[in-house]
Amino acid sequence: MKISVGLYGTNAHQIALAMIQGFNKHYTLFRQTSREAKTRFEQADWLGVHKAVKERIRFYDDRVDECVERLRNQFDAASIDDTTWQQVKLLYIGLLLNHKQPELAETFFNSVTTKILHRNYFHNDFIFVRPSISTENIEGDDTQTYRSYYAKEDGLRGTVLKIVKDFDWHRPFVDLEHDVEHVYHAVRHFLNGMPPREVNFQIQVLGSAFYRNKAAYIIGKAINGATEYPFTIPVLQNEAGQLYLDTILLDAWRIGLLFSLSRAYFMVDMEVPSGYVQFLRSILPAKPRSELYIMLGLGKQGKTMFFRDLIYHLHHSEDKFIMAPGIRGLVMLVFTLPSYPYVFKLIKDVFGSSKEMDRATVKKKFMMVKQVDRVGRMADTLEFSNVMFPLKRFNDEVLAELQQLAPSCFEVDGDQLIIKHLYIERRMEPLNIHLDRMERANNVERLEHVIREYGSAIREMAQANIFPGDMLWKNFGVTRFGRVVFYDYDEIEYMTDIKFRQIPPAPDFETEMSGEVWYAVSRNDVFPEEFATFLLTSPQVRKIFIKYHKDLLSPRFWLEAQEKIRSGYVEDFFPYPQELRFINRQTDLTEEQ
């Protein structure tokens, strides 16, 4: 259908205008809070940072609901006929021709229409199953996606100075020239000497800093001949309010870890988000675009792109969904597609007898994880509703488990299986399986690494105000980089809501030996001394854990962590090794000079 001039001014045109106005309002608010991240960083308003991240998550759904309500009240959305809806989509496309965020606006259109239309309309005639507007080479009106620098006149040191100063932070640096010297020597060491500069030598830097927690990140790449060198420079602030360059990350894989879904989302002021994603993809080609959008705070766009990728993969693969390996959970039913690196989780209709909660509580726990700082220790999830899969792609075991444990969560419509509510997250090897493999292989070095990681995960979550609740090995996974991450959320609580207690002495020897509890226990009481009994049954594992994390087995650590959180203290979490920090490399600089 071609767009007719006669459609302008019609009901369809007014509906399309209402929808683009709804999106524009959303993105204006999104950019405003992202822009304010610079001020929060300068003012060291760390509690404000966490508050802003939590509030921003609600922005999208609030604007979608607002737009749906407007269409229902102003246009009687339920009575709009099919022809008009098709015209609305075509007119909406016309409104996106010169838009700076067309891909986000298309996703907003989908979010609104799928709340109004039946799923039979979820195809490209009515919604954007495929994108309609190219996002290639969109230029901003007010800002550049990236800035280019040439070291011919100022030299490399002078150019790095200019790059940092161009971010215009309203805080003094402790000693910027000294930090730049560190940058220079770190680069020279990484490259085993400075290569000759080609005629096209330049440094490209994304125009907005990336703000998260207590850090600002400068992200860019150097181009020399046919070679590109990605880099990231974290900028931190000391207690005196002075800034300093903490390190420079030069390995692409290490930069990629900054964008891990187990970490909090960035705040970035982007006029053209597709330009930022395109730049990031040039330095992180293995990172899916969907994950980059998510980490930029654009979760709905990330979900849209993820699902398009999944459907595309299903069209080009033949394997079937199977039950995920590992011990079956009491709350979640989990399956996976072997050829795709994700797991799919449903909330069961009936939980195990030891679980005292309902479906609504579980959903709140998953939302809680999105709103907190995951500090690289909690897997992010993508939440979907009414997802259609080819029925033939499920093996008999998965279908039987669905029918037995979650019959209200799915339905079959012809050759499609529709799952009403679903969480999707990155697949990891369950820690209990990994430990068993390492013990059987007598791989002591690897065993020590993951047990140390396990304790560090618990410690860092606690410092970020999260108590995992069920700390059994099966509730943690091991990433492909060897990092231990928590992924079972039905029992998590805020640290500040837990009462950590020491087990009181038994009144007599007989009582102590009886195996019965001799003290009163309330719902949120936790006794850290009991952890070893349930978790450290293997002598080898127990020895390693106590070597690194003995303090986690006493109330003192937990009470001190609570006290810090309640006082408003925000812990420092570094998404890179301590040995890379310039403060720990002073001798390297002295030796090179």
Swiss-Prot record:
It catalyses: L-seryl-[isocitrate dehydrogenase] + ATP = O-phospho-L-seryl-[isocitrate dehydrogenase] + ADP + H(+). Bifunctional enzyme which can phosphorylate or dephosphorylate isocitrate dehydrogenase (IDH) on a specific serine residue. This is a regulatory mechanism which enables bacteria to bypass the Krebs cycle via the glyoxylate shunt in response to the source of carbon. When bacteria are grown on glucose, IDH is fully active and unphosphorylated, but when grown on acetate or ethanol, the activity of IDH declines drastically concomitant with its phosphorylation. ATP binds at residues 324-330, 345. InterPro entries: AceK_kinase (IPR046855), AceK_regulatory (IPR046854), Isocitrate_DH_AceK (IPR010452). Its EC number is 2.7.11.5, 3.1.3.-. The active site is at 380. It is found in: Cytoplasm. The keyword Cell membrane does not apply. This is Isocitrate dehydrogenase kinase/phosphatase. The keyword ATP-binding applies. One of its GO terms (molecular function) is ATP binding. It comes from Dechloromonas aromatica (strain RCB). PANTHER family: ISOCITRATE DEHYDROGENASE KINASE_PHOSPHATASE, PTHR39559. GO terms for cellular component: cytoplasm. GO terms for biological process: glucose metabolic process; glyoxylate cycle; tricarboxylic acid cycle. Keywords: ATP-binding, Cytoplasm, Glyoxylate bypass, Hydrolase, Kinase, Nucleotide-binding, Protein phosphatase, Serine/threonine-protein kinase, Transferase, Tricarboxylic acid cycle. Belongs to the AceK family. It holds the Pfam family AceK_kinase.
